[in-house]
Amino acid sequence: MIKAIEGIITKKEPTNVWIKTLSGVSYGISISLFTSASLQKGEKVELFITQVIREDANLLYGFIKESEQRIFEMLLKVNGIGASTAMAVCSSLGPDEFSIAVMNGDDAVLRRVPGIGPKTARTLIAQLSDAKFGEINSMPSYQNEAFMALESLGFKRDRISKVLNECSSNDTASLIKEALKKLA
């Protein structure tokens, strides 16, 4: 199974890239819009790869961040979610936004993704609510600590996330103080 590909981008479209490796083999790889935004034709890159083997095709999905790849792979395990819907989620929501929406049960955020209606959003929340997003979440550790402290004080997750994004402190104690002022 292919887990990563390193090479030069020879062709780039919004959701696809062609990477030529040192051995001369070129791979066509589907990518999210977030990954696409950070890639340029002609540059050397390494993408984390998820390989999906179907009866009629062998598909490669590439991600610049491992956290985005983990979200994609989690989504593939949800009943009724295929690779194209999982890629639509990765193109519409960043790993942090997705994990917070699932943890908060916020189906409105999930319904913004093309191809996800109310029923699919509820299914995603139900099946992923116990998922371990801590390793996916890319917030710095001081923000995670502040998040957990504020949550233990009874504040709602969505409100905490919004306030923490507005704060400028770079250590746990200062961040909690700043957030409490805004939450009050």
Swiss-Prot record:
Biological process annotations from GO: DNA recombination; DNA repair
Region described as Domain III: spans on this chain: 138-184
Region: Domain I, residue numbers: 1-64
Subcellular location: Cytoplasm
Highest taxon of the lineage: Bacteria
GO MF entries: ATP binding; four-way junction DNA binding; four-way junction helicase activity
TM region positions: none
Self-association state and partner proteins as the record states: Homotetramer. Forms an RuvA(8)-RuvB(12)-Holliday junction (HJ) complex. HJ DNA is sandwiched between 2 RuvA tetramers; dsDNA enters through RuvA and exits via RuvB. An RuvB hexamer assembles on each DNA strand where it exits the tetramer. Each RuvB hexamer is contacted by two RuvA subunits (via domain III) on 2 adjacent RuvB subunits; this complex drives branch migration. In the full resolvosome a probable DNA-RuvA(4)-RuvB(12)-RuvC(2) complex forms which resolves the HJ.
Similarity comment: family membership: Belongs to the RuvA family.
Record comment regarding domains: Has three domains with a flexible linker between the domains II and III and assumes an 'L' shape. Domain III is highly mobile and contacts RuvB.
Cited function: The RuvA-RuvB-RuvC complex processes Holliday junction (HJ) DNA during genetic recombination and DNA repair, while the RuvA-RuvB complex plays an important role in the rescue of blocked DNA replication forks via replication fork reversal (RFR). RuvA specifically binds to HJ cruciform DNA, conferring on it an open structure. The RuvB hexamer acts as an ATP-dependent pump, pulling dsDNA into and through the RuvAB complex. HJ branch migration allows RuvC to scan DNA until it finds its consensus sequence, where it cleaves and resolves the cruciform DNA.
Name under which the protein is recorded: Holliday junction branch migration complex subunit RuvA
The organism of origin for this protein: Campylobacter fetus subsp. fetus (strain 82-40)
